[in-house]
Amino acid sequence: MSKVAKYRRQVSEDPDIDSLLSTLSPEEMEELEKELDVVDPDGSIPVGLRQRNQTDKQPSGSFNREAMLNFCEKESKKIIQREMSVDESKQVGRKTDAKNGEDKGSNASRKALGPRQDSDVGKEPKKGVLKKSFSRDREEADSRGSEKPKEEKVIRGIDKGRVRAAVDRKEAGKDGREERAAATTKKEEEKTGSVRNAGLSRDKDKKREEVKEPSKKEEVKLTAENRSTVGRQEDGKQKESREDRDKKPEVKGIGCGSRDSRKEDEKVKKEETQPDKGVREEGKTREKQPPSGPSKPSDGQARAEEEAAPSIFDEPLEKVKNNDPEMTEVNVNNSDCITNEILVRFTEALEFNTVVKVFALANTRADDHVAFAIAIMLKANKTITSLNLDSNHITGKGILAIFRALLQNNTLTELRFHNQRHICGGKTEMEIAKLLKENTTLLKLGYHFELAGPRMTVTNLLSRNMDKQRQKRLQEQKQAQEASGEKKDRLEVPKVGALPKGSPKPSPQPSPKSAPKNSPKKAGVPAAPPPPPPPLAPPLIMENLKNSLSPATQRKMGDKVLPAQEKNSRDQLLAAIRSSNLKQLKKVEVPKLLQ
């Protein structure tokens, strides 16, 4: 019995299900049968193929074969153009290197043969030989002049290829959406496309070989021509030297003419090398110009932000400089347009400010220059109590400069410099711990020490500073209470030393004799000491402090003991018995109930 048969029996037994099935259309019945159809697993069929394919979907758009082929052709053309441009640039570089090497070789050969010709300057050469040398020089100049336009044409071709590649990229960007919609191809058409691409790649290889062959031929020709010209020059020079040796020096003017001809040849060569350098420089500038285009708007934005920043921070800067009483806090946290120059100006303005107590510049890209300016400001400023330097670019040098300035500052109580771009390191942490030993006012330090040693020492130093601040507060309270008690005593002293009611009132005009009599009495008799002040409240404060520092259990025990001081009659009797002797006690008869 299969599962389907069992399910059908259950369905037939249930009348409600039968009625539901009767209402279904034939299409719905087919779907239901497909879902209920359970096939026994076959071991020979892979697991992924045992179920029916539930991922079959209809194509979202129609396939355009022509668009696909056009796209493949454009892409192959772009690749060919890129490779051609790269090959041409390499060939131009090789040609220029070969020319430079030939020029160096010719210059060296001329230098070697120069002293021989100079030694034979006084001798008279033939006119035909001179004409031949001039004609050869002209031919070399003409050949080099013809090579220049060739190189310029090659460079122009490279630039044209780059322009075409840029235009093709723009066209490809416009047509990209249409081509992406048509990119869903079938397997057969993919095969045809791959075959065509293979054919195009073969065409590319052929073109490369064709381009390389003429380039190699040109290089071989150039080397052969250079060798032939060098050989001709050497032969002509040898002939001239032989003829000069045979003849005697008759005229000296001819030697001067040969020198002038050499100078002219050198000038011509220099002029030929200069345009080559100019062509190279133009190529470099063209390569550098394209990236400079998109950088212009970014430079303009940066300049606009720098110009806008001073306008935003001008008012607070003026308030800080003018010591405005309302300006008690300078907060420039997370400002994008602020620069290090503006931060330095703020610190310079705060140097002589006596109102601002909080200076916060977190996440403002402040560097060591700002840190050094803050250190100078802390040495002079005696009002700032909080400084926030979180999330900046300050290094260990700037932080140590700030801590050295704290040795001369006794007002800063909070300093935060966590999450800097550069890690402080163990050395700076040790230096911070050493410098904090001499500071007694810093109470809060916003930094997580990586080393355990400096971390423990700094926590102990901060707790020490907290205790010192608490002791100072207590002393100030005592002094204030003592001052208030002295004022009360001064007010009560005249009442004690007042005259009795029956004594006559002194006259408004004092007698002249009374002054000299009173002065010796005051000098001889010591003044009466002031009465002792009343008991002060500090003991109560100390008791409260003791209670606050003692644990709760001891306080409860103490509270319970206090009411026990009032003794009952029984306690009094027991105390009397303990203090009495046996002689004082009287014998008492035992009561009858206890007998």
From Swiss-Prot:
Location in the cell: Cytoplasm, Myofibril, Sarcomere; Cytoplasm, Cytoskeleton
Record region (5 X 4 AA approximate tandem repeats): 503-522
Positions of Sequence repeats: 165-180, 181-196, 197-212, 213-227, 228-243, 244-257, 258-273, 274-288
GO molecular function: actin binding; tropomyosin binding
Biased composition (Acidic residues): 27-40
Superkingdom of origin organism: Eukaryota
GO biological process assignments: actin filament organization; actin nucleation; muscle contraction; myofibril assembly; pointed-end actin filament capping; positive regulation of actin filament polymerization
Keyword Cytoplasm: yes
Composition skew (Basic and acidic residues), residue ranges: 72-105, 117-127, 134-193, 201-224, 232-251, 259-289, 467-476, 484-493
Any single GO CC term annotated in Swiss-Prot or TrEMBL for this entry: sarcomere
Compositionally biased tracts (Pro residues): 503-513, 527-538
InterPro entries for the chain: LRR_dom_sf, TMOD, WH2_dom
Tissue specificity comment: Detected in smooth muscle, in stomach and uterus, blood vessel wall, and in slow fibers in extraocular muscle, urinary bladder and sternothyroid muscle (at protein level).
Phosphoserine, modified sites: 12, 85, 135, 550
Record keyword DNA damage present: no
Coiled coil: none
Boundaries of every WH2 domain copy: 569-588
Alphabetical UniProt keywords: Actin-binding, Cytoplasm, Cytoskeleton, Phosphoprotein, Repeat
Chain's role: Required for proper contractility of visceral smooth muscle cells. Mediates nucleation of actin filaments.
Protein name, entry field: Leiomodin-1
Gene: Lmod1
